[in-house]
């Protein structure tokens, strides 16, 4: 998962490379790191908004893209998985600091991708553990599944939006075959999940309108996707500004089609019923979600610090400030992991933690 530098404390990292060495590095790895920072930050914030800031108690079932398979685990299994992942997160936090300090922006970007995926997985497991702990309290009634998993389809919508945003914002010179392949595969994977999920919901719907609307929504989405992916293939075969502009042009209808389909699919009648829990169950849930929020908030700050450093590679007072913020945010990640582990072990809050209905992660 990470390099051998993991043996050092999280708050420490390798000595910074000379400013001249960092400033002389190719701008391409830095630009990619900025892009990775934006994507990881958006993904972590979305998952936190959906799973940690919700007042509802629902299981988190991981099927389809980015599955971690933990949805059917017991609380004890979730707890052990989360604690193990906090250790991996500490390793990655140290690695990304070291790589950045040595001017290895490409490696830092790769580590950040892994860190972002790990935070998402940890958040999903934490939300599921919080649900399991809450429904285990006296008087609790478990959630009833609906036709659609709001979390999964909303994640897919976000990924499609991100892929289309990349196509709109990337200059022609940076549209490498590898980037186009990654975007195409990401779009196809998430669109397939949406298609399968909505087809299943259509089959199980009781009223005629819903059955037909799911089918029509999928058809609209598929048509828009085919038009966009044809433009992406054209850019790969015959790159030109005209071909690139077509990607931007046809990405709009796909985003609109996916937004409409997910908006319909997440109407209350398709989502089942959240668990009913007592005040005791709510307190247990809040403690675990609050611990997870401490981790996510710190990782969002870490990502923002990395972005600032990637954009200001030439030294100076700002660079020193950014490095200090990076060290502080890395320490906050470590502290958040400790709080989450303690909340899971004790099923109570080790300190006053943010309420689950607070504002979105900033």
Swiss-Prot record:
Regulation: induction: Down-regulated by microRNA MIR574-3p.
Sequence ranges of Low complexity compositional bias: 13-26
Region (Disordered): 1-26
Keywords in alphabetical order: Acetylation
Protein name (database record): Talin rod domain-containing protein 1
InterPro entries for the chain: Talin_IBS2B, TLNRD1
Keyword Isomerase recorded: no
GO cellular component: stress fiber
Species per Swiss-Prot/TrEMBL record: Homo sapiens (Human)
Function: Actin-binding protein which may have an oncogenic function and regulates cell proliferation, migration and invasion in cancer cells.
The keyword Signal is annotated on this UniProt entry: no
Subunit structure: May homodimerize. Interacts with F-actin.
Gene3D superfamilies referenced in this protein's UniProt entry, alphabetically: Alpha-catenin/vinculin-like, Talin, central domain
GO MF, any single term: identical protein binding
Modified residues (N-acetylalanine): 2
